[in-house]
Design a protein with these regions (language model features):
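Short, Lys/Arg-enriched N-terminal segments with co-localized hydrophobic residues
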Residues: 11-19
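Soluble catalytic regions of membrane-associated enzymes that act on cell-envelope
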Residues: 222-310
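Membrane-embedded alpha-helical bundles of multi-pass enzymes
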Residues: 20-224, 274
Length: 310
């Protein structure tokens, strides 16, 4: 038997809808940061980079006000940085000796600190009507995204363009307009798609897509062809495959250095003119250790090769 009392209360259903409406902008903002993080090398879901501008713009659209758009941008940026740089936890905990909670706190603090720039970009964009927001947001985000290259940040990783490093036809445009130009086109295309699906911003969205598409096409067409110049140089890029556990173990320092020396000597025997050592190839600081720096220089002269570090 079906009784009226078995039906959900209309007030209960209305409360759920209200809660969902309140939560939606914050969930969309978090999804925006996650979408871009998943596009980065590693996860490699490249096309999700196109989604993040629309998700964040929709979050801003659903939460008008003076401060909320900025907070939404900050949430999106924080999620992006926390997911993208999650390696901070094992580095600080497993190898740096910090307690697990302290390592998590370092990651969250760094993500929140870097996410502030996203908050500024979202706040600036929200100051304009939706149609103009499509144009301003990509410019604001990319312009503010340049700041981490300088103090007090000094953090140059995970630019938007790095999501497309495995797309040679896009990477070919970098000599024309750099990672800044490519990153802007990605954000502008994503913002344009968001505008295109909304009735009131359809013209602005279509216009942004056309402009970004033309700019991208011109940059690709203007890309300089690869033309050999000068004498050919044989380059050896060595990869010793040293694990983090080994790098942070002082007892392994000598073995790591000997492995790099051995690979460098083998490359020289095979005719290499230039040998590239990866970042932190050896557990010594050549800038502060004059004795070891002299050893590297002497070894390079002995092998008759140029050694390029980092």
């Amino acid at each position: 038997m079906y009784l009226a009392r078995d039906c959900p209360s209309p007030k209960w259903g209305a409360s759920i809808l209200v809660a969902m409406k309140i939560a939606a902008p914050w969930l969309l903002a978090a999804a925006a940061g996650l979408a871009l993080a998943l596009a980065m090398p590693g996860p490699g879901l490249t096309l999700s980079a196109i989604l993040f501008p629309g998700l964040l713009l929709e979050a801003i659209e659903r939460a008008p006000g003076r401060w909320r758009p900025g907070f939404l941008g900050w949430i999106a940026g924080t999620v992006f940085w926390v997911v993208t740089t999650n390696w901070v936890i094992p580095v600080m905990h497993d190898h740096g000796g910090l307690p697990q909670l302290a390592a998590v706190g370092c990651l969250l603090g760094m993500g929140a600190y870097l996410g502030v720039l996203w908050g500024f970009a979202a706040g600036l964009a929200a100051a304009l009507p939706s149609g103009w927001r499509i144009w301003l947001f990509p410019v604001a985000l990319i312009a503010l995204g340049v700041l981490p290259r300088f103090p007090p940040y000094g953090f140059t990783w995970t630019g938007i363009a790095s999501a497309f490093i495995d797309w040679p036809w896009l990477a070919a445009s970098l000599p024309v307009w750099g990672a800044t130009g490519l990153g802007w086109s990605v954000v502008a295309i994503g913002a344009g798609l968001w505008g295109l699906i909304r009735t009131e911003t359809r013209i602005a969205g279509a216009s942004a897509l056309v402009v970004a598409g033309i700019a991208l096409g011109v940059a690709i067409l203007m890309s300089p062809a690869v033309v050999p110049t000068g004498e050919p140089v044989t380059v050896a890029a060595i990869q010793p495959g040293t694990s983090l556990e080994e790098k942070w173990d002082p007892s392994q320092s000598r073995a790591i250095a000997e492995r790099v020396w051995s690979m460098t000597a083998a490359a020289a025997v095979q005719g290499a003119d230039l040998v590239l050592w990866p970042e932190s190839a050896i557990p010594y600081n050549l800038e502060n250790d004059a004795t070891y720096r002299e050893m590297v220089e002497s070894y390079a002269r002995e092998l008759d090769v140029e050694i390029v570090l980092n």
